[in-house]
Amino acid sequence: MTLLSLRNIRKSFGAVDVLHGVDLTIAAGEVVGLVGDNGAGKSTLMKTITGIYRADTGSIEFDGSDILGLDPGQRRRLGIEMIYQDLSLAKQQDVASNIFLGREPTKKLFGLVPGFVDKAEMDRQASRMIERLGAHLPSINRSVGSFSGGQQQTVAIARALTFNPKLVIMDEPTAALAVREVQSVLDLIRRLRSEGIAVILISHRLNDVLSVTDRIVVLRHGRADADLVTANTNMNEVVSRIVGGGDIAAAAAHEQRG
């Protein structure tokens, strides 16, 4: 079942054309890698999906509804969630405070009027969310700034899940992580897929993309240059598509950088 459908998406900033008629479909529960060199249009495309940017032309349908005219908040309520590379965590606060930031459950005074933040309930729900992910954190009462990069990624994913998303867009989730933490994050992505949540994975780490995705879409100069079934492709083909095909020296150099 198609969850997200983009047709002929174009986006310009002044005289600069960034997206040139991009088509993209994502099925429910599918993990799709979005790859391409810097400047290929990945960030612009993702911000067009989330509503931060408005497409100049084309159509965007999500879960059967036209969302082209909706703002980011409306799209989020429909089930589109994005985890940015910087994670946007309040690092001086603990796990529950980050997960419920701005949406804290409250206790009712005398059983009638909402009053104080219910920290105990926040902690209970946060613990259940981390358990749902099959992840481990040192303590939900510690500031997330004391956590490793992979543990912080876990908190960001848990926060995204509280919005009951149907699609989670992840921007470079394994960048600068140790090998063990990379595997933990990839396992979290697999867990999302097992729950029927679609994932768009933006990454320059092609080994990670190949290990966890169902399909790989290559953006090149603002166009969807290739849509590959992961099981039927390999590193060489993906790199060749990224650099334009046929340039063996450039492909080898790109693979060494990745």
Q: Which sequence ranges carry the predicted segments?
A:
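Glycine-rich phosphate-binding loops of nucleotide-dependent enzymes
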Residues: M1-G258
